Amino acid sequence: MTQFSNLPIFERARILVVGDTMLDRNWSGLAQRISPEAPVPVVNIEQQTATAGGAANVAMNIAALGGQVYLCGLIGDDDAGAVLRQIMREHAIGDALSVCALPTITKLRVLSQHQQLIRLDFESNRYAECAHLMAVPFNRALPEHDLVIFSDYGKGSLHNVSALIAQAKAAGKWVLVDPKGTDFQRYRGADIVTPNVAELTAVVGHFADEKTMIAKARACLIDAGISAFLITQSEKGMTYVTAQQHYHLPAQAREVFDVTGAGDTVIATLACALASGYDCESAMIFANAAASVVVGKLGTATLTPTELHHALAPRAAKARGLVDLSQLQEQLHYLKKQGKTVVMTNGCFDILHAGHVRYLEEAKALGDCLIVAINTDESVKRLKGADRPANTLASRAAVLAALHSVDWVISFAEDTPADLIAAINPDILVKGGDNRVDDIPGAQWVREHGGSVRVLSYVDGFSTTKTLQQFLSHHEKD
């Protein structure tokens, strides 16, 4: 599996997006009174925006991540179609938007103080009649791309999706599908189909637990001739299922502001990673991290490689065990701009026991992320004696990094972490035991810079020294 310490590079990805293209319009303003004509709010519109939606939003996400993308879809000979085409040009997205004698699909949302009051849809139920218009541009674009995404919103543009998938597979292309409806047989031959829980339930029926979901999903994909499902499960994360195996990835904890278009971001990121040569598990991790970012934005949104890199940073730190100061400072700058609370503690953590685990869980609960600074081996020897530490720095860091409560582990060679604390400048500094706040290294700096210092009680009955003595005693008896 890929290491995640470097910025993801997707510029080699050549992706063809085919599907239901839409224009999302947002009108926002203040709603401070009720209409005298009917019991409805009156909104004084102050701002109007237009963004790409549906398959066009998938293309926007790919372009934002640095991939090369080409869009095939339908638009009407109208203002909305012209706006959508202009958005594609502004973002250097190649397109073959075929003009049909029907209106461009448009979603108009009226909002006040970020709350959606109403959505008005402008569309027809006859787009299937125009689906043949995409055949020629699809045939021309297919040889120039490595992967094809079919973005199905059930509007009719993908009326002939089965034939298009067969054509793409015959050409040796990756095929990903964001599905709609209850007939997954239409997607026969696809490499990965990405239903959410509601979409999967509509096809396989109700399931009470993860095990049943996986069993039903597996039976469905085998029957439909699909290689794999990537099931998005909102706050539960996502699950990758094939005929032989499954893999679950928990969601990254983030504040959810708006889930509009999150599925587009997932499939776009997955496609960029696969088309760039990453393995399926790494691509899934990228997609999961991307979703955690985009749900914190209003409306259909995209993310940049830098945002994705920051979202992946905690996982990279976990994988390495130790993180260096410059990387940590970069990540903390990003988090503090988001208003996150950074907690820091320190210690030798030579032999991790239940008392340590409880202490670190309590420390993490004080904020959004926890940094654990640990003494180097030489520093431990100076503090504890020549026979310590029992475990090397790398071993201690790896064990700490494996804890759910710990976000980053960093080392310091000095006898105290005062300089490191000043460099990190946490919002909350935590120590355990009977320490007086004034005696805690770095406490004065933290308080002078607007932070706070907390002393947490250790759990009775646990001690590294006591644990070592008991081990040596038992060893001598043996």
From Swiss-Prot:
UniProt source species: Dichelobacter nodosus (strain VCS1703A)
Span list, region Ribokinase: 1-319
Entry's family note: In the N-terminal section; belongs to the carbohydrate kinase PfkB family. In the C-terminal section; belongs to the cytidylyltransferase family.
Gene Ontology biological process terms from the UniProt entry: ADP-L-glycero-beta-D-manno-heptose biosynthetic process
UniProt keyword terms in alphabetical order: ATP-binding, Carbohydrate metabolism, Kinase, Multifunctional enzyme, Nucleotide-binding, Nucleotidyltransferase, Transferase
Cystine connections: none
Recorded catalytic activity of this chain's protein: D-glycero-beta-D-manno-heptose 7-phosphate + ATP = D-glycero-beta-D-manno-heptose 1,7-bisphosphate + ADP + H(+); D-glycero-beta-D-manno-heptose 1-phosphate + ATP + H(+) = ADP-D-glycero-beta-D-manno-heptose + diphosphate
Protein name per Swiss-Prot or TrEMBL: Bifunctional protein HldE
Encoding gene (name): hldE
